[in-house]
Swiss-Prot record:
Cellular component annotations (GO), alphabetically ordered: mitochondrial inner membrane
A Gene Ontology molecular function term of the record: RNA binding
Transit peptide residue numbers: 1-25
Protein name per Swiss-Prot or TrEMBL: Mitochondrial escape protein 2
Key words, A-Z: Membrane, Mitochondrion, Mitochondrion inner membrane, mRNA processing, RNA-binding, Transit peptide, Transmembrane, Transmembrane helix
Superkingdom, natural source: Eukaryota
Role: Plays a role in maintaining the mitochondrial genome and in controlling the mtDNA escape. Involved in the regulation of mtDNA nucleotide structure and number. May have a dispensable role in early maturation of pre-rRNA.
UniProt keyword Transmembrane helix, yes or no: yes
Similarity annotation: Belongs to the YME2 family.
Species the sequence originates in: Eremothecium gossypii (strain ATCC 10895 / CBS 109.51 / FGSC 9923 / NRRL Y-1056) (Yeast)
């Protein structure tokens, strides 16, 4: 109705229908209103920016109805929507409750319209003035009621609202002009004095300072709070005083780009500060998650697998219950034991368990040749019922070719999650960019050594938390209170400490060799802090020096695993094939005693070349259980071992000199159980660097070398089965001829290379004018060339002879 009346008045009186004081000439002109009326568009406040009201209405502004926006990303603007009802009906009900409460109602007061200004946190409300009240009386009552009602809340200091009569003509706009505690007053007409400005604006809040209008043509008023500035802007803007119209708006926020300017103008300060803040955030956010992930990896508390202690306990209880029921029914379960060892290994398992129940404060080092069953003895026989175990495989870490692959493997083994290996490339580029801009490195990029060390430090904190999970600072016994230190608790409860198993530990590697040093130092800290038992599994005694440097002045607990004796190996195989003596006689292939005895002898003959190496015995048992005869199983195992030797040591991909050295040792060890180191030193292929060549072959698993006070002494096959494989390679005529021919050709190439070096030296000596000076050297070189030529001639003759056999 209001819009129709205004439109009708405009059509009757033309452009004079709307006066300046009524709608504010600055905001909307009569021409615009005329065009809107002719087009039939509504003259709403949101469309035109002007609030229209009649003489019987009053316009009030309520603040603190919505959370005001002091920035574009203020979070209260968003979560407040979830915490409170901000619908149009709810806001109207709230305003009416504040303006006319039940305790002091304004009879006949009618709320006609509300226009929310969510950016400023307030609402414009239009009320119809009752006939028995004047506009001033209604405004005073609404102000008093609002102040009284909003003060009743317990959070009144934060939620208190206020109502102010609108004296001017507010401009309803939704521009991106954020509220500020400083308002700018533009005056159309004669300027106002400071006293007049203070009198007009003070009622909305405490004013800190007033800056009169200067050459810029506007005055500035600084409030102590945002609320005062917002209310002044919405209630005073558009007012006309003494022929001057005041237009109030917020002073533009000049700090919008302060952070950007700080980074641009002070990069040497800003970039390290940003990196420090990011590091702090990463530590606060991700470190607790990573510690929890590592704890879960060790305890397996939330993993539904057989390694979970709870699942393991349930399975143990179930197995015991089933066995008890079967025993009551008279049925004996003759299933074979899952874990069987010969007597020597049983004693070692008992020793290892006893050490874990004590506070040794030192390393436990389990040493044995490759395939001796170190992993099985420790993990399956000793720690199978231990609740907290962390297993680390050094071989997986050492063989990681790229940095990201190394970090992923390390994180997977430790349980370190989350990890972002792709950040290495990004941080490296950022570091280069920062260095180009500032002239100094940012320190953002970290090497894989540093990141691996950080992983271990985080794991140490998790291990400590697990070890102290049952710790209580005080113990109450009646009226007595005993204080217990963490060190005393760990000393009294060694069973609470986790067990860290570090497998395939060595002292050096071609790549990622730092892993051994870092693990040794980390393990020494765990032992010194008395928060974990640490077990190292090694193939030789060479890593002992590295461990001694990490944990000096300590005597290690050593456990040496050797091959089983003939009787122990035979007993182990028979116990695996036929777990109980009654079943043994039933399951034998022959029914009579002679056949049984013959079968035993066949197994003994098969075990003779296999020896007592644990993994080979297990492979033999699996083959026999699958249906193979003992002799057939032995034959296939020898063929498999010989194929492994040819692929690793005698293939064309290997270095010629190393292949020739390997074949020479194969020939010697096929005829002798032991070869002395002194017999190898003076052979042509080993003469230049005998120790390096032998150690390389030992590292690759072809031979094993015993030492006497650190000096190489005896050379043996890496495992007993290899001796049979060596003999197999020599007995196979066709294969032996091919391999032997390759050996001679490599030996010829080796001697030819030596002759070339000597001939080059002879050319240099030939340029000397006085040959008498070099006579002794010339004779030496001539003798060496003669010797090498003799070797070449001998090898060529042998190659020709073998070619005739093919």
């Amino acid at each position: 109705m209001m819009f129709l009346e205004m439109q009708r008045a405009f059509m009757l009186h033309g452009r004079r229908a709307v006066t300046r004081s009524a709608v504010g000439v600055r905001y909307i002109s009569e021409d615009i209103q005329q065009k809107d009326a002719q087009a039939g568009e509504k003259a709403t406040a949101t469309a035109t920016g002007v609030i229209y009201k009649s003489d019987e209405e009053t316009l009030m502004y309520f603040d603190n109805v919505y959370p005001r926006a002091t920035s574009l990303w203020r979070p209260t603007q968003w979560y407040n929507i979830l915490l409170s009802n901000q619908s149009r009906e709810a806001v109207r009900e709230k305003i009416m409750r504040l303006a006319s409460p039940a305790s002091n109602p304004v009879h006949g007061l009618e709320l006609r319209s509300t226009i929310p200004i969510k950016r400023d946190g307030g609402v414009f409300a239009t009320f119809r003035v009752p006939r028995e009240y004047t506009r001033a009386q209604v405004n005073a009552l609404i102000q008093a009621n609002t102040q009284q009602e909003s003060s009743k809340s317990l959070l009144a200091a934060f939620t208190r609202a206020a109502a102010f009569p609108v004296k001017g003509v507010p401009w309803i706009e939704d521009l991106k002009r954020l509220p500020n505690n400083v308002v700018r007053v533009e005056v159309e007409g004669p300027a106002l004095s400071e006293e007049e400005l203070y009198s007009l604006f003070r009622r909305y809040g405490t004013i800190l300072d007033i800056y009169p209008a200067g050459k810029n043509g506007y005055a500035t008023i600084r409030y102590r709070s945002f609320r005062g500035a917002i209310c002044a802007k919405n209630c005073v803007s558009g007012i006309e005083i003494n022929g001057s119209t005041l237009h109030v708006k917020f002073e533009p926020v000049v700090r919008a780009h302060a952070i950007r300017d700080f980074f641009v103008n002070h990069p040497r300060i800003a970039i390290p500060l940003l990196i420090a803040l990011l590091s702090i955030c990463a530590v606060l956010i991700f470190d607790p998650i990573r510690e929890f992930s590592i704890e879960q990896k060790i305890t397996r508390m939330y993993t539904l697998s057989r390694d979970n202690f709870v699942v393991k306990s349930i399975l143990r209880l179930t197995s015991y219950t089933v066995s008890s029921v079967k025993h009551l029914w008279g049925y004996d379960d003759d299933q074979p034991e899952k874990r069987q060892l010969w007597q020597e290994r049983v004693e070692k398992v008992n020793d290892l368990k006893m050490w874990l129940e004590e506070n040794n404060n030192t390393f436990v080092v389990v040493t044995g040749p490759r395939g001796s069953g170190k992993h099985e003895l420790v993990m399956q026989h000793t720690l199978h019922d231990r609740p907290n175990v962390l297993y680390l495989d050094c071989d997986t870490l050492i063989k990681s070719r790229t940095d990201s692959k190394f970090l992923r493997n390390a994180a997977h083994q430790i349980g370190y999650f989350p990890i972002f290996p792709w950040l290495n490339s990004v941080t490296t580029l950022v570091d280069l960019a920062v260095q180009g801009l500032t002239g100094q490195k940012s320190g953002l990029s970290e090497s894989k050594e540093t990141q691996f060390r950080n992983m271990l430090n985080t794991a140490m904190m998790s291990i400590r938390h697990i070890a102290l999970s049952g710790y209580k600072a005080t113990l109450h016994s009646g009226d007595d209170v005993t204080t217990v230190k963490e060190e005393d608790y760990l000393q009294q409860h060694p069973e609470r400490k986790p067990v860290i198993v570090i497998d395939r530990f060595s002292n050096k590697a071609e790549i990622n060799g730092f892993v051994y040093k870092e693990l040794a130092d980390w393990a020494s800290m765990l032992v010194q802090m008395n928060i974990a038992h640490v077990i190292f599994l090694t193939e030789s005694v060479s890593p002992n020096q590295l461990l001694a440097e990490a944990l000096p002045n300590q005597v290690f607990k050593f456990l040496f695993l050797s091959d089983a004796s003939k009787d122990s190996a035979r007993s182990y195989v028979l116990s695996q094939l036929y777990p109980s003596s009654p079943a043994y006689s039933e399951k034998m292939p022959a029914a009579d005693a002679d056949a049984n005895e013959e079968y035993r002898k066949e197994i003994d003959r098969a075990l003779e070349p296999i020896g007592g190496r644990m993994l080979d015995l297990q492979a033999f048992v699996r083959r026999v259980k699958s249906g193979e005869e003992p002799s057939e199983a032995l034959e296939k195992m020898v063929e498999q071992a010989s194929e492994q030797i040819t692929q690793i040591f005698l293939s064309e991909r290997s270095e010629p000199i190393k292949t020739a050295q390997a074949w020479e040792l194969i020939e010697l060890l096929s005829q002798n159980d032991v070869v002395k180191y002194g017999d190898i030193v003076f052979r042509p292929l080993f003469k230049s660097s005998p120790e390096a060549g032998l150690l390389e072959l030992e590292k690759n698993g072809l031979i094993t070398i015993s030492r006497n006070r650190g000096v190489l002494q005896d050379i043996r096959p890496a495992k007993p089965l290899f001796k049979a494989a060596f003999s197999y390679l020599l007995q196979d005529k066709d294969l032996s001829i091919v391999l032997r021919t390759g050996y001679y050709l490599r030996l010829i190439a080796f001697e030819t290379g030596r002759i070339k070096k000597w001939e080059e030296e002879l050319r240099l000596l030939a340029k000397v004018s006085d040959q008498r000076i070099c006579k002794s050297r010339l004779n030496y070189l001539a003798s060496k060339i003669d010797a090498s030529s003799g070797v070449i001639n001998s090898c060529e003759d042998k190659v020709k002879e073998m070619s005739k056999r093919i």
